[in-house]
């Protein structure tokens, strides 16, 4: 049997959105227990200890932000560092485990592959970024680049459908896979760098429509609220609202990386007024 695991999961916004219940706690506990059990396959000595872990996430899970993958990676990194495993070896193993957990729980669509690249990422080959006992590269492969640009993330506090409700549904899976493959192919033809920003925005919009995801009432409502806040706040010319997949959430990104977003505080205040949780962040490092 696995060792006792006591944990506290803090999504970083719990004081603003007290919507988490016992079901959320149970799901998170299973996430970390699954991670620990898979970790023990490669590092059996972790089973010799009782563990108490505090996992702090800056965003909610289940909203298309990749927090399940990020939480699993952080958890496995911490456990391995605690028993003296070198960082690079441990981090590779953590990414591999997080990918396996996402597959098992149907909780991600390439989130871990994206995390391994960082920044604005494109997945070239699906699969775990590292594999096998030697933690060699692949089969998954992704590329990323970064830029100095602020982004607003906005979401409904009560959360949306779990990713598994789409991945495990043959009709949804077919629509998402078809739209994703088509738009990914169009993005893969040229070099992956900052010059592709307008292509990314266009493909994101096309994917949300072609997959049918933007037609769901909960998503279209959040998108409408964001676009209205941008118009009223004076941001409609500098930014664009894009759906996050597969949450009930939106990323407000700049039309131009050089110019960035304007009237950020005003728009965030309007998002607060209409009941949307939101946070100001930026494009990540690679």
Predicted regions: what is each one?
Residues 2, 10-26:
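Short, small-residue-biased leader/transition segments that mark boundaries at the very start
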């Amino acid at each position: 049997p696995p060792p006792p695991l006591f944990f506290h999961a803090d999504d970083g916004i719990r004081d603003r959105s007290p919507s988490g219940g016992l079901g959320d706690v149970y799901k998170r506990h299973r996430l970390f227990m699954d991670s620990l059990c898979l970790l023990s396959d490669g590092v059996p000595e972790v089973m010799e200890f009782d563990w108490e872990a505090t996992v702090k996430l800056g965003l909610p899970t289940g909203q298309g932000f990749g927090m399940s993958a990020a939480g699993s990676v952080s958890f496995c990194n911490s456990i391995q560092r605690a028993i003296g495993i070198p960082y690079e070896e441990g981090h590779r193993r953590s990414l591999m485990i997080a990918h396996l957990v996402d597959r098992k729980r149907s909780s991600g669509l390439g989130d871990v592959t994206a995390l391994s690249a960082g920044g604005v990422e494109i997945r070239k080959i699906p699969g775990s970024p590292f594999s096998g006992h030697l933690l060699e590269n692949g089969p998954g492969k992704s590329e990323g680049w970064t830029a100095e640009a602020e982004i607003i993330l906005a979401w409904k506090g009560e959360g949306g459908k779990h990713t598994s409700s789409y991945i495990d549904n043959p009709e949804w899976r077919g629509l998402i896979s078809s739209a994703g493959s088509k738009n990914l192919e169009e993005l893969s033809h040229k070099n992956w760098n900052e010059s592709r920003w307008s292509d990314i925005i266009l493909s994101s919009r096309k994917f949300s429509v072609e997959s049918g995801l933007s037609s769901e009432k909960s998503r279209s409502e959040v998108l409408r609220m964001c676009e209205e806040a941008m118009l009223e706040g004076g941001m409609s010319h500098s930014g664009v609202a894009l759906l996050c997949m597969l949450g009930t959430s939106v990323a407000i990104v700049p039309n131009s990386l050089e110019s960035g977003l304007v009237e950020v505080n005003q728009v965030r205040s309007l998002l607060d007024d209409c009941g949307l949780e939101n946070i100001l962040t930026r494009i990540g490092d690679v």
